[in-house]
């Protein structure tokens, strides 16, 4: 039936029978087409046709299942057109509607519904909404903690004290996360108990024989391979340089030492040899003819190796068996208590679901698993009778996207497939044993393998959903390509999507950086993509572009001054990268007549001009970057749409409606009430709101309105309101003087609000929300605004959410608001309603995850200089599905806390797995492109970074694994791979990197590396803004030419106020302003002092900036304000306090990076820290205002005119504390210090006003004044 010309490998994937077949399908290999064709061939086989309902086809998404069903239906219909009388085709078309083409969850639900009688669940069960589940979980954990507190459960109390900090919400988060994590295991309770028992070591415990020791050794060997390369590179330099041959012997000894370590299989021997080794000293010979540059180079490389080996020595030296054993024994009770706590929580949560006849998403797989499995007398997990019936029913089980399977799904599929073997636990891990099992009934005819699995481990990017790529990898390594094998694999690496230029570039890059260590697979020539698509000769392909910009590129003061741009404004990195991308898109699209890129249109069968819809911008995450890019592209006139999962709850229409619901539930909330009052729903002006607030500033705003309402209506105030009225006559006068229109407006709103509150009790929440839309007219109003269609779509989503909520077990407005809040915080917001059609001519911005399975003519991958997200590694307890728990060691009695050995091992393992995931995500991103691929990124300090890249180029075939392991961004991988490519020569020359590379790679891939100039982008933007303003001014003045008022207008615009200088004197100054005034150059005249105010864009309109020096200072000051010195005995204590500020949302994780625990600890342990600890009266961040004569600051002013002029000096004193003989004033500074005297002079006037303020406020003497300088970890005394 198919007219497709299949490759030999594709034919094998379609027609191979009677085996378990793993199809390894690279990007663009046409795996879906192959899978569909295999199904068609099965159902139309002339010798052994199989009805389509006898196949189980498992897809990753519902959309994929629908597409597959549609493709099969189209193929059958096409066959019927050719042979209308075919009974087989007609039968298959009829059976298609009841075919088993579905997601794994749909199949599990089918199993549950067909076999509910075997379970203790109601046949009318409902799947609970995710947010409903979150609400139930919170109820369950609150109740559980209350019960355990009440009975004073000792294990629980110890857990709280060790891992909950001040609030038990921290421990609740640990329990909820561990519960979710455990549910990815087939048998969660067993997994939880096994992981805790891993800490239950006996007296004969020998760390050197454990899995942990082997892991440490293997991780260190990766580093040793890097050291080996460095030493080998050094030896090559020694042998090829003049006059340094005497270095050869010690370097050779070092290399032999490294080689010996790499051969060790025993941790004991490995550890012993590293600890015992002493590097031989280099000979101190002088040779006039010696190549000094080469000599210095090899010494540097050796020093680097020595330093790293010393670090490894120190680590291994701490791995003393008795110490580790004590650590395990100490942690065991806590970890056992944690496992039991999670099990108790799960039972309570399960009970709540059963009360409501609910199951959640995790239950679907686990209930199905319990139906399909049994245990035999040996305790092995084998198929149940129901599973054996499914084995009889399904002639073949086909699994799409197999690389994204988790262990629960793998066990389920093994139960319904005809596989020989059983599952059992070994060392706490569930493993499959491929052996014959004894069943009560012989399975005649069911011994022929029938499993078909298709996927690509290089595209496994769902580890965060507990996908386990190792399942695919195990079969990939075990299965054979030879025919007539029971377990066979076929590789499909011919790519039918992309141009040769894209494929060659992808192959080059991943051969360089992907390995078993990072990526979990060696990207060899065998794994490489092969060109399968033909684009003809009419249009030549273009090289892959890498566009780089230096974050640290200095813009001179002259340029900043010339363009009137603040340095921070100039260096907004995300904005500038967005601007760069906009310029690239403009160039690509051209003017749609000529000059733009031509792309091949598959539907037209010919080339056409590139359109905006052909372009996608991919990002690792879109939440912070996409809005900035949207704005930058829009400024350039480029239509753009960002597919994000954020922003919905920040839209004006949703904030207003949620505020309305909040005050209907409880009107005593000022912020939501004022939001509604200022909205078109109530239309109060700011002046009217001020008048209302004048009633009483100490009560809620609603209570003020209620008092006005009652007194205006001549209603008697009850005792509650009377309590707040000190002078009823005064209140009556305020109300009497109040505008009559305002009083009526207040009464109308109060009466409406009371009616709405009453109505909310009697109707369902979805009905009530629609009633409010109509009653207030807000839905229609939103539609009349700009982007009205989008706004109304957002309001409809809120209505749909309410409808969804109405079906849950929770009722009432209060619970709905709670539901929305949980939705907001648990799901990380939502994207706005999607009203854009697929064919809209816009550039799309989306995350790499959302692009999986899609393809685009042009792909721009942006944000490659952004750091990988490793925040999960900072938690006090880590979890790993194979290695178990990685807790901090916390001894509350001795007040000791540090990462345990097992935590460090698990932390490193998770880090490597995260890096492997990021490697695969990068692969997915680059393989979305059909014709053109552009990569953009920002770099910190271009010269230094490129030099680092050059130092990693010793191996032309591979970037060293240790370098890939230490990568923090995609550019950390891409850069070292490309810097040695032949196409990077001109780039290196541009940066004046003239040192000769011995390992330039002459690869067939084509690259174009561009260095973008921040200054030029900034200059372009400022010039564009100036032209726009200039044009508007010209247009206005042109219109004035014909006006009779021209002369008068010019006269008024030219008016100069007589006391212009006085108008420039502020009524208030901060201490910092005073400091700046006093350090002005002495030659500066008064006219310069009073230079005109420059109107600039308000800060709230500015885009998000990088952390500036001033913001850095603010963050450190904020931390010092909240620092508890009594709980700052170690760096870990300080990290804990930093994490608390992050949790309380005082600072973000990114901002926390500027706080150095080491520096804070030095302050705490220093003299000033100790003095603060000993003081009984410590005050932080004390604001003050004092009045002083203006002439004290502005000495140049006319003394007669300004003699009575006063200024208010305002400031905040960082810290002062009291000792027996007076006050001590302390101010923190984060400036970089070159000259102590300069610093003292700079801040002397500031400290003077702080001292004066303290004297006036406290009436006490300030005996000492200090500046603490964090840059040098020391203080200076101000006289």
From Swiss-Prot:
Q: Which SUPFAM superfamilies match?
A: P-loop containing nucleoside triphosphate hydrolases, Restriction endonuclease-like
**Catalytic activity from the UniProt record:** Couples ATP hydrolysis with the unwinding of duplex DNA by translocating in the 3'-5' direction; ATP + H2O = ADP + phosphate + H(+)
Q: Which PROSITE patterns match?
A: UVRD_HELICASE_ATP_BIND, UVRD_HELICASE_CTER
Q: Which UniProt keywords apply?
A: ATP-binding, DNA damage, DNA repair, DNA-binding, Exonuclease, Helicase, Hydrolase, Isomerase, Nuclease, Nucleotide-binding
- GO-annotated biological processes: double-strand break repair via homologous recombination
Q: What does this protein do?
A: The heterodimer acts as both an ATP-dependent DNA helicase and an ATP-dependent, dual-direction single-stranded exonuclease. Recognizes the chi site generating a DNA molecule suitable for the initiation of homologous recombination. The AddA nuclease domain is required for chi fragment generation; this subunit has the helicase and 3' -> 5' nuclease activities.
- Stated family: Belongs to the helicase family. AddA subfamily.
Q: What is this protein called?
A: ATP-dependent helicase/nuclease subunit A
List the lineage, top down: Bacteria, Bacillati, Bacillota, Clostridia, Eubacteriales
